Amino acid sequence: MLEVERLEVGYGALAALHGVSLTVRPGETVALVGPNGAGKSTLLKAIAGLLAPRAGLVRWEGTPLTGEPAHRIVERGVALVPEGRRLFARMTVRENLELGAFTRRAQAEKEGRLARIYEIFPRLRERDRQLSGSLSGGEQQMLALGRALMGGPRLLLLDEPSLGLAPRVVETIFGILRQLHGEGISLFLVEQNVQAALTLAQRAYLLEGGRVVGEGEGRILLQDEHVRAAYLGPLARRG
């Protein structure tokens, strides 16, 4: 289980997170929604070891992650799929995937894991030797997911996986996330498509101004007046 306890994170004099506490249970999909600038991406980066908290604790499977380097957190079974994909454009699909298999165990199982990624994402197999910079946005998101999966995570941190994608491609990506959830991988999802996120998630947290201001089941939050007014637009407010 992922446990975040009273986490404080900032940038210089600017405080971004104020005592954030939340949990993600084994095999659970949890969404984190909120306005731009609320601190959602900051929280994911702090969990993944890319930002050092000022106070508080991140615990995974009963052991603290706080202060661990990012590569050690991946070895522990937690992987981040960053906003904007963060691929190496001049490297091939296969080379980008192989970068995700940097732990000792992943290296030993690299070929089997590659085969599994190509089973999940057949379009990546078709583009195995293609430069990642020439892929479509949807294919690049599949590659970013695949690279994270090469490390064999038990928890995926997903930062805006639908950003910039056409609706049909978003459906494909979320279908893959449902498949991964069905395989027992825990998902902690930051997503600007609130409708899709709350439909996918068993539970969700609302983050505003760096503070958790609400929590509940995804399907129930979809009907919440504040959530509908703030995040689902005028059509939702009228409906």
Regions found by a protein language model. Give the residues of each.
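Conserved ABC ATPase signature
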Residues: 131-135, 139
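The feature captures the beta-strand-to-loop junction immediately N-terminal to the Walker
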Residues: 33-35
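Helix-to-loop junction immediately C-terminal to a conserved catalytic motif
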Residues: 48
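Conserved ABC transporter NBD signature motif
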Residues: 56-64, 76, 109-114
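ABC ATPase C-loop
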Residues: 148-149
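ABC-type ATPase nucleotide-binding domains, specifically the catalytic core motifs of the NBD
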Residues: 12, 68, 93-112, 120-122, ...
